[in-house]
Amino acid sequence: NRADIYILIKRGTNLFLERINLSVDEATEYTDGAFSIHLDRRVQLETSGLTTVPYTDSATIYIAQDGGVIPLSSVAGKLSAGEVVYAGIPFTFKYQFSEPVLKQDNKPITTAVLHLRNYAVVYDKTGFFTVKIEPLKRNTYTRTFTGRIVGGAANILNKAAIDSGTYRFGVVGHAGETDIILESDSHLPCAFQSAEWEGFYVLRSRRM
């Protein structure tokens, strides 16, 4: 498969040959709602194939087809029922926005101070992420998106809520002194298409 990358990794005294698929996630064939599952060293457990995790790591978690986290004691029952279970190690995704810059005739405006007011992030087939706003010399505050929107078609009981849309959040601070970070430590997918911001700027000087 030309979409696969094989990596030989040495961990301690052991060598591991691991594969990364850069194409469509195979998990979409089995999960309820056809969503991907994001785990490091992920393996697929099923009765007709691998039934135990081929490595030892205390951080390993197990995910059922509905996207829920299940204990190790429930894995055998899921496999006996003909379901697929995914196992792997959670990791943290982070993305920090670059500083917004006002431009005129494709040149930055350096005679004004830009203050941010709002951000809007367009997400696609996403189940979880957090937004961290870190203003200089002020406390960090966090907003969390869980995919569960009141009245939304994806908000189904006992199912992972995977949704697409626009998430808006407030940002009050100087553009050059405020860090805005998207973050997710969940196994549920998060994908972002674009973002836009709203603010106001104040001229520091004016020619007479």
Please tell me what each predicted stretch does.
Residues 1-208:
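Beta-sheet repeat architectures centered on beta-propellers
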